[in-house]
């Protein structure tokens, strides 16, 4: 597995880099021996650049999950020109690390560092273009140049994509060259050229998949990339960012683990996500979510009634869900009290519930072992509020799945079913993708909470996979099959917001549908959102005061009307 750890060494380097960066870091002509180039400064920059790529993954991970209906972060689409000022500024601050590496390797003496920086830049900038569209690129990062440019032009999103695709190819060329001195402080690829070449090919594949409908040669180039191979295909090759249980001198636990410290309440998780995983007997359920309560809120108690989720959506009292539950588990008559208490632990909200926030933090379901490194929570584990539970604040060694083997299998399935010319057996790929993602989830749980977590019985996984392949087989057309696959990707996307948001914008799938067992769609918002589905992020108002070239983008581009160049679907929800 390709992993990266934000270790103590990386954190300690941050202050040093801020000092070194103020010097003329790129002047490597101080070397007197051309056969022994000075790579120390590059070794300091590399972990920062890798963390910057992590930041490109997490920048709007939560909101993208909300756009997709996985939890409540920005799921009402009430966005404005002040919503993402920090995201915009962070993009250019993070990418500066990669720019410094590229400047420092222009002399050709450190090709592997250069290739790595190119890969990280292509991945990161690709994510930001998927968020905002047109952005400063060719004239960016020149504020401190000999001839400063503090008002860079905005490049077209399609032009940036072309440059990033070429950047991946250039990275592969650089990585094939001999590196005189070993690469140091590489927490993602251990300085291995083969590993980084594989990541470069995978990033290129992702860029080609996203942009295929917006480029004249999109399908042909995507097919060529799949035919060429060399991208991530096995779990051992997964590109993953790992956290640890370290809390001193700097906390290095997974960001979602903050709930376990008792200092922050979790987002409301989608009732549909949790409820359908219950009904579908999804083996990932106890790894995804931790239950804090078994108490069913008393509707005769004003306080409990005020904490009850809006509009009859509360699962233990939701008749439509309980009817589905009885069918799924073969229950005749009343549902046992123990079952209702178990269901009560999956306390969240329906999509686009904009009602006020109650004092319900100790009731909310919270992220479990995957990806947060939290606590496993099956029926045998007693639910307990995290407030004041120091005994549960022991983990946090979670992960972010940057790009995994199951992602690339889903990429291939989409390409096959959507008629791009890419070949393969989509059903076999679907089965493999499900099994590989489940295995990652289980492994994380066994690592983070070994005393509680249990490996699912093989027959349970087999039954689950068969149920979804049966849905796939029953779908009459390739587009219907792609929708089934997209709904499974939705379940897989717990912790991976950008990929599911991109999928919805590329394909329009999963479709809008009801909340029930083995539904192949996403439920409609429970209340009408103030805006439509987010096709992109709004440009930050603050940028207009800094760069006059931004003004027209701030005023003329509407986030729920104007798509990214590759989005030909323009997803809209029926309210």
Write out the residue ranges for each language-model feature.
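Short, compositionally biased low-complexity segments
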Residues: 21-28, 66-74, 133-141, 448-461
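Sec-dependent bacterial lipoprotein signal peptides
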Residues: 1-21
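Short coil/turn segments at secondary-structure boundaries
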Residues: 61-65, 290-291, 497-506
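Structured, solvent-exposed acidic/aromatic patches
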Residues: 40, 69-120, 124-440, 478-480
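Membrane-proximal, proline-rich intrinsically disordered regions
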Residues: 23-75, 82, 87-92, 100, ...
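C-terminal functional modules
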Residues: 409, 416-420, 435-575
């Amino acid at each position: 597995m390709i992993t990266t750890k934000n270790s103590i060494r990386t954190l300690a380097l941050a202050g040093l880099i801020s000092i070194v960066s103020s010097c003329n870091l790129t002047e490597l002509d101080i070397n007197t021996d051309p056969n022994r180039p000075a790579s120390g400064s590059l070794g300091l920059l590399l972990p920062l650049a890798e963390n910057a790529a992590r930041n490109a993954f997490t920048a709007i991970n939560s909101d993208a999950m909300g756009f997709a209906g996985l939890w409540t972060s920005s799921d009402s689409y009430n966005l404005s020109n002040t919503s993402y000022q920090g995201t915009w500024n962070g993009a250019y601050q993070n990418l500066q690390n990669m720019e410094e590496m590229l400047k420092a390797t222009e002399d050709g003496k450190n090709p592997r560092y250069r290739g790595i920086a190119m890969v990280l830049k292509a991945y990161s900038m690709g994510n930001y273009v998927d968020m905002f569209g047109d952005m400063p690129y060719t004239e960016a990062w020149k504020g401190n140049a000999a001839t400063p440019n503090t008002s860079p032009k905005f490049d077209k999103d399609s032009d940036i994509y072309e440059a990033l695709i070429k950047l991946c190819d250039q990275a592969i060329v650089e990585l094939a060259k001999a590196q005189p001195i070993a690469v140091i402080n590489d927490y993602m690829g251990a300085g291995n050229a083969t590993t980084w070449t594989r990541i470069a090919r995978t990033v290129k594949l992702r860029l080609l998949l996203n942009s295929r409908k917006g480029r004249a040669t999109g399908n042909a180039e995507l097919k060529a990339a799949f035919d060429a191979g060399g991208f991530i295909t096995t779990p051992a090759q997964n590109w993953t960012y790992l956290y640890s249980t370290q809390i001193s001198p700097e906390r290095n636990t997974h960001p979602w683990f903050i709930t376990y410290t008792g200092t922050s309440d979790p987002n409301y998780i989608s009732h549909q996500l949790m409820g359908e995983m219950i009904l579908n007997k999804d083996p990932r359920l106890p790894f995804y979510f931790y239950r804090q309560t078994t108490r069913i809120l008393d509707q005769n108690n004003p306080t409990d009634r005020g904490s009850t989720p809006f509009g009859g959506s509360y699962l233990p009292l939701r008749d439509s869900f309980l009817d589905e539950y009885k069918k799924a588990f073969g229950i005749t008559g009343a549902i046992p009290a123990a079952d209702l208490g178990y269901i009560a632990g999956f306390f969240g909200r329906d999509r686009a519930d904009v009602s006020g926030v109650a004092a319900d933090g100790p009731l909310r379901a919270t992220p479990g072992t995957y990806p947060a490194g939290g606590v496993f929570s099956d029926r045998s584990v007693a639910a307990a509020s995290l407030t004041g539970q120091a005994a549960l604040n022991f983990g946090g060694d979670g992960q972010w799945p940057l790009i995994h083997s199951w992602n690339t299998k889903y990429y291939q399935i989409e390409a096959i079913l959507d008629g791009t010319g890419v070949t393969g057996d989509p059903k076999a790929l679907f089965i493999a993708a499900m099994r590989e993602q489940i295995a990652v989830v289980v492994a994380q749980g066994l690592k983070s909470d070994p005393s509680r977590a249990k490996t699912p019985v093989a027959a349970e996984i087999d039954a689950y996979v068969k149920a979804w392949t049966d849905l796939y087989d029953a779908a009459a057309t390739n587009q219907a099959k792609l929708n089934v696959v997209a709904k499974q990707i939705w379940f897989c996307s717990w912790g991976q917001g950008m990929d599911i948001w991109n999928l919805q914008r590329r394909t329009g799938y999963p479709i809008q549908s009801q909340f029930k067992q083995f539904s192949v769609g996403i439920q409609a918002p429970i209340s009408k959102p103030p805006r439509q589905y987010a096709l992109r992020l709004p440009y930050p108002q603050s940028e207009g005061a800094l760069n006059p070239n931004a003004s027209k983008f701030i005023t003329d581009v509407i986030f729920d009307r104007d798509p990214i160049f590759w989005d030909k679907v323009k997803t809209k929800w029926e309210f």
